[in-house]
Amino acid sequence: MPEANKVYVFIDESGDPVYYGNRKKLLVDTDGFQPYLFIGMIETSDRKALRKAVVDFIESIREDSLYNSIPSTTTNKGWYVHARGDHPEIRAKFFELLRNLDGYKAHIVIAKKDLNIFNRKHNNNPTEFYFDVLHHLLNGRLLNVDCQYNLYLSQRGNNSLHRFQQAVDKALEANEIKTHGKIKYNLEIIASKEMPELSIIDYLMWAVQRKLLKGESRYFDALKDKYETVLNLYEEDIK
């Protein structure tokens, strides 16, 4: 059963907030440049069920002779479910799992990189850009003063607990005005391989990214009812 009055939030990203490389070389329109930053989250009150579903999936792959000879599952003892690196057959099976998995809702924010916005709003600072997008993701989401929110941010790049705290505090300022109460929360930054629940939002973001960058919508369409919001900050909604 879900834990009373506890909500778990798992946050991940795809792409990066970087515009410049070594010696301040502008990377826009060069090979390897990531044109978008995606940050997404899932909310659940039944963390144990989600975790069990992912862990059971990993164990079933390792025990199945049809899949356990795939190199990524045999050469990497720390293998975990990760959309970009997973074998297509494993990826398809995990999407099937997600189609039938309940007990969570997803939110995604898409930020197309715009150099003018980066210069004007984010002071040429990729960290400011990242946490501004994170603020948009969290804004208006954590509203129940009777809940204890537990937020887990996937450990990537220059993520820091201090900046995470700032982004959450900024998002909660407006929320607390609306709710006339103090929102209770805990924060933690953790590696994806140590938190199986993060694989769920990783796959949900991969589906959005695939639709946007490759024009392949079948993954997104298969999970469409799992997305509560998909916010495209600078362009039209993709839904």
Please report, for each region that a protein language model flagged, where it lies by residue.
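Phosphate-ester processing/binding pockets and catalytic centers
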Residues: 1-239
